Curated annotation (Swiss-Prot):
<feature type="binding site">
    <location>
        <position position="202"/>
    </location>
    <ligand>
        <name>Zn(2+)</name>
    </ligand>
</feature>
<comment type="similarity">
    <text>Belongs to the QueC family.</text>
</comment>
<keyword id="KW-0671">Queuosine biosynthesis</keyword>
<dbReference type="GO" id="GO:0008616">
    <property type="term" value="P:queuosine biosynthetic process"/>
</dbReference>
<keyword id="KW-0547">Nucleotide-binding</keyword>
<dbReference type="GO" id="GO:0005524">
    <property type="term" value="F:ATP binding"/>
</dbReference>
<feature type="binding site">
    <location>
        <begin position="10"/>
        <end position="20"/>
    </location>
    <ligand>
        <name>ATP</name>
    </ligand>
</feature>
<keyword id="KW-0862">Zinc</keyword>
<protein>
    <recommendedName>
        <fullName>7-cyano-7-deazaguanine synthase</fullName>
        <ecNumber>6.3.4.20</ecNumber>
    </recommendedName>
</protein>
<dbReference type="InterPro" id="IPR014729">
    <property type="entry name" value="Rossmann-like_a/b/a_fold"/>
</dbReference>
<dbReference type="GO" id="GO:0016879">
    <property type="term" value="F:ligase activity, forming carbon-nitrogen bonds"/>
</dbReference>
<comment type="pathway">
    <text>Purine metabolism; 7-cyano-7-deazaguanine biosynthesis.</text>
</comment>
<keyword id="KW-0067">ATP-binding</keyword>
<dbReference type="GO" id="GO:0008270">
    <property type="term" value="F:zinc ion binding"/>
</dbReference>
<dbReference type="Pfam" id="PF06508">
    <property type="entry name" value="QueC"/>
</dbReference>
<comment type="function">
    <text>Catalyzes the ATP-dependent conversion of 7-carboxy-7-deazaguanine (CDG) to 7-cyano-7-deazaguanine (preQ(0)).</text>
</comment>
<keyword id="KW-0479">Metal-binding</keyword>
């Protein structure tokens, strides 16, 4: 019997690394996909390569996109500052339609690979309030995937799996540690330096640090 395949979105951060480990533990052959989309730094792409290697991905693919050509986000437009204090509403670090774009490309690769499962590390508990991290979005994308693909209309449906959806950051970290994730390889910071060191001030850094503290696990994050 052939091993079931999964395409997994891997940013190089804590959440997506955990998802790779969870999929592997569930018996999937893992095909990881990252995006060089014009983000502020390349440290997360280097982290994604390290994580894919450590967790035994069958293939790690990096797709080039020019989302900074559109701008509209502090992560793709250097003229918009990354906030270093909590904010109300959807923060300026939201990248317009990013998860829709990423999942669409993962869907295409999954169809080529004849993989039925696509994993994404979105979370609706300890998160920044992005609309494309909500359960409603994941469910809607799965419906679209099965309407928009040859595989879907022929009855070989896709599943969009978001195993972290209802977990706290501490629970995510505990799940990853139990499955052998080396979080020292990951980068979560929105404005990490060239060595992957974190600022310790942005929303992503705060969520990460609070998660390690709540989990009672030492935080391996290097800071500048």
């Amino acid at each position: 019997m052939n091993q079931k395949k999964a395409v997994i979105l891997l940013s190089g951060g804590l959440d997506s690394a955990t998802v790779v480990a969870m999929a592997k533990a569930d018996g999937y052959a893992c095909y990881t996909m990252s995006f060089d989309y014009g983000q502020r730094h390349r440290a997360e792409l280097q982290a994604a390569e390290r994580v894919a290697r450590q967790l035994g991905a069958i293939e790690h693919k990096v797709i080039g996109l020019d989302l900074n050509g559109m701008g509209g986000s502090a992560l793709t437009d250097d003229s918009i500052a990354v906030p270093e204090a909590p904010s109300q509403g959807i923060p300026v670090t939201y990248v317009p339609a990013r998860n829709t774009v990423f999942l669409s490309l993962a869907l295409g690769w999954a169809e080529v690979l004849e993989a039925r499962d696509i994993f994404i590390g979105v979370n609706a508990v300890d998160y920044s309030g992005y609309p494309d991290c909500r359960p409603e979005f994941v469910e809607a994308f799965e419906r679209m995937a099965n309407l928009a693909t040859k595989a879907g209309v022929e009855g070989n449906g896709f599943r969009i799996q978001a195993p972290l959806q209802y977990l706290s950051k501490a629970q995510i970290i505990q799940a990853g540690v139990a499955r052998g994730v080396d979080y020292g390889l990951t980068v979560s910071c929105y404005q990490a330096d060239d060595q992957g060191r974190a600022c310790g001030k942005c929303d992503s850094c705060r969520l990460r640090a609070d998660g390690f503290a709540a989990a009672g696990i030492p935080d391996p994050t290097p800071y500048f």
